């Protein structure tokens, strides 16, 4: 027990050593986040009100003297004080002595160690010492408190190592509750401004269960007539009236009219009014927005959800979908999640602060940038989470290790997926959702291993048979051909480019449906989806495309392969290391050839995407850029003619040029970029000359009208053309 001194009217106590050290740390160190003091004190007031409400359930007489529950703020600029008053359970003399100074809370030392280790001051409430945050802005604190079991007492301290307690007869009596009077430091007067106090209550305590009111100045203008304000002038006017009345008796009708007009003017003058300003004070409730997540979903209207969403997000549009739920049992929390109508333009900006989910603990705002609360792929979801189990003011340092938060996160993801599935039942709404947030779903496929199969059910793609409609993987599988083994897909830059790809020729001929994957993120997502409902996904631009063939077809193809073997070798010799090998294939019907990639390497589209990455790892790029495989169509007339010419003369320059031209063209039709566009252009020009029967060695004739290069430019004349 700390030492105690008595004076005739008050008792002086020394702070416990740990508390004294904590106060010294708060007063002498610099903290930028001082505004949290109000959150802590309002939270303490709310706790005190919860306690008396609980006591009143057992014994209604506890609230006979003061049946109202309230928290009130009063800023006194004249005395530089901020008062926070509540009608909670109040404190006895013993409570004031023990709770506010002589008995250290178990968390006092732990909080000091956390502060010295660099933690945020906003953690103070987590350790049960939130009251002392008052000294962040005040150099003296006065606590007036009245408990039903004791008289009214006042506690006071300037945090100078001691505090005083005495029976209170100098302050306005409390029926029950506590009144904190903060004597603000000279540089903290911003907390006397109505605007600032409203801002802090809205930010941190808007959803406290009890009404929070602020004493505000109200200016009212009233109209006062001049005759009320200036009685002397009125008397003078009356005397003038009397004199004129005596003269009126002898005047003509015309003069009577003149006098009447004069009287009207005079009457108007008499009734002339002016405005007087009166300043009054009244209580303005600050937390009018009730926490609708505390109500049952069946009790909340669509209009209330829309109003709350706009207030929460400052969005000018209504939300697209909402999920309102609560989790009870070993863990309790309530949540309200919204899907907006459109994605923010900077949704995937890496440096953007994620602040879409606001975290509350027992209606007290904690933070709005808790990245551990929801995965990145769901960062577009907006809403609130209110936990009954998390410690108040949980720190960022302990978030990642907090098991409660991990359970909340898991439930939020589950409920989001339920919400998205509900949206699929509304075709137009889901179409809007998918247009805006399909990239997020695909990012979820890439990142969320636990929910990958559920997210895959939400994916939609255009196909060779769907026209402009989007098709789900389930719909695709349900209408697969009986002899079809795989889910076929093709990746590319656009629907137009993939729709005319040579890789689709045989698949279309067999009436197999192919998925178009034209979003760059599709390349990453599809690598994680190995199969769907037991059907493996197969890229039709990579080697290993297996198609069911009859025995006769197989024998016929084997004969063609053997026949084309010399041409394959010759093409490989010409192209050298540009291709890994040259093979005969069955995937083409109309095209002579194309370039395929290895099954585990990058596709042409992925290669294009990765080359566009400015900060890519070049070592990985070279590893994944596996050699291309040239696959030729042995049934195509070009290949047959080329085989015949190569057989006649392997040194034929035209054959060599044609091989290179086929390779370059195959690069383009297969989705790759040209390695040497200039060489490709030269080959095209030679083919044009050949088609025009021009000599390949022919040079452009000299133009005699062209001045020599060594002549001055000014001497040359340009012919004028009309």
From Swiss-Prot:
Known Gene3D superfamilies for this protein?
Answer: 3.30.230.80, 3.40.50.11260, Heat shock protein 90, C-terminal domain, Histidine kinase-like ATPase, C-terminal domain
Spans of biased composition, class Basic and acidic residues? Answer: 233-258
Would the keyword Chaperone be found if you checked this record's keyword annotation? yes
**According to the UniProt entry, where does the motif TPR repeat-binding sit in this chain?**
718-722
Q: Which GO terms describe its molecular function?
A: ATP binding; ATP hydrolysis activity; ATP-dependent protein folding chaperone; unfolded protein binding
Question: Which positions bind ATP?
Answer: 44, 86, 105, 131, 396
Where is the protein situated, by its record's location annotation? Cytoplasm
What InterPro entries does this protein's entry cite?
HATPase_C_sf, Heat_shock_protein_90_CS, HSP90_C, Hsp90_fam, Hsp90_N, Ribosomal_Su5_D2-typ_SF
Q: Which Pfam families match?
A: HATPase_c_3, HSP90
Q: Where is the composition biased (Acidic residues)?
A: 223-232
Keywords on this record?
A: ATP-binding, Chaperone, Cytoplasm, Nucleotide-binding, Stress response
Which stretches does the entry tag as region Disordered? Answer: 219-273, 698-722
Superkingdom classification of source? Eukaryota
A Gene Ontology cellular-component term: cytoplasm
For this chain, the family text in UniProt reads: Belongs to the heat shock protein 90 family.
Q: How does it assemble?
A: Homodimer.
**Domain comment (free text):** The TPR repeat-binding motif mediates interaction with TPR repeat-containing proteins.
UniProt function note: Molecular chaperone that promotes the maturation, structural maintenance and proper regulation of specific target proteins involved for instance in cell cycle control and signal transduction. Undergoes a functional cycle that is linked to its ATPase activity. This cycle probably induces conformational changes in the client proteins, thereby causing their activation. Interacts dynamically with various co-chaperones that modulate its substrate recognition, ATPase cycle and chaperone function.
Protein name per Swiss-Prot or TrEMBL: Heat shock protein 90
- From which source organism is this entry? Theileria annulata
What lineage is this protein's organism placed in?
Answer: Eukaryota, Sar, Alveolata, Apicomplexa, Aconoidasida
